[in-house]
Amino acid sequence: MSVVQPAGRRLTVRDIASRKSPAAEPVVCLTAYTAPMARLLDPHVDLLLVGDSLGMVIYGLPTTHGVTVEMMIAHGQAVVRGSSHALVVVDMPFGSYQESPAQAFRNAARILSETGAAAVKLEGGREMAETVAFLVQRGVPVMGHVGLKPQMVHAMGGFRAQGRDEAEAEAVVAETRAIAEAGAFSIVVEGTFEQVAARATREVSVPTIGIGASADCDGQVLVIDDALGLFTDFTPKFVKRYADLASTVSAAAEAYAADVRARRFPAPEHCFGIRKVG
């Protein structure tokens, strides 16, 4: 059972960055895309990630490539409004930062100023280190994302775990180190062989947040729709389902439809009637 966090100030980038030592409590992260969901998750987590995964789980897109800055801003605003405790981080979508550090800064600054979120997340290894440093030097906190990078799914040959051989393992460790040295305050390590993710965690001085990686990471994140059993198109190997809300929602809709068709709903207690006087 989750431990409800005490009410008080919202967690900061510095709070998350400090959770690195083996004695530190692991960082608890979940994705959120709406104010009601953020409100439910906020007391239990340290970080709410407004992930570009919303393109697939909310909008039904086949990949995250169709997600826009405007979509991320709208959902980022909702999550910030719905939370008061967790640090809120917003993904930078595909095409919004890869062209140049200047492009990345323009879009990151817009995301932060229009949402009220504390940080942005971007994918990439050594090729993005210059961009990460450029943003951090200009006051934009950055969470990195290495290993399996969904925005590069086509270039990477699909959704396949990284670190299968020595060359891939070294590449994952090197990109984790490069992003940490560039100034990221934490790094998501996704879809990476356990031993490789554990090694990458040991070799950097900032917290790693695992998703399909290792229990040795400094924190964990899951897509909330996966964890709640709401997204049923497919279930990644690394997902643990904590509920089966798809079945619950379907059963509720079925019961509602039956009541309407049988004229059991609305019942008198659900209707506004005229009071009798005298």
UniProtKB/Swiss-Prot annotation:
Annotated metabolic or biological route of this protein: Cofactor biosynthesis; (R)-pantothenate biosynthesis; (R)-pantoate from 3-methyl-2-oxobutanoate: step 1/2
Superkingdom in the source lineage: Bacteria
Active-site residues, record numbering mapped to chain: E190
UniProt binding sites for 3-methyl-2-oxobutanoate: D52, S53, D91, K121
Entry keyword annotation includes Metal-binding: yes
Binding site for Mg(2+): D52, D91, E123
Keyword Cell membrane among UniProt keywords: no
Any one Gene Ontology cellular component term annotated for this protein: cytoplasm
Pfam families hit by this protein: Pantoate_transf
Record GO biological process: pantothenate biosynthetic process
Cofactor note: Binds 1 Mg(2+) ion per subunit.
MF terms in GO: 3-methyl-2-oxobutanoate hydroxymethyltransferase activity; magnesium ion binding
Catalytic activity: 3-methyl-2-oxobutanoate + (6R)-5,10-methylene-5,6,7,8-tetrahydrofolate + H2O = 2-dehydropantoate + (6S)-5,6,7,8-tetrahydrofolate
Entry cofactors: Mg(2+)
EC number: 2.1.2.11
Localization, UniProt: Cytoplasm
Subunit and partners: Homodecamer; pentamer of dimers.
UniProt cross-references to HAMAP family, sorted A to Z: PanB
Homology family: Belongs to the PanB family.
Chain's role: Catalyzes the reversible reaction in which hydroxymethyl group from 5,10-methylenetetrahydrofolate is transferred onto alpha-ketoisovalerate to form ketopantoate.
Name of this chain's protein: 3-methyl-2-oxobutanoate hydroxymethyltransferase
Encoding gene (name): panB
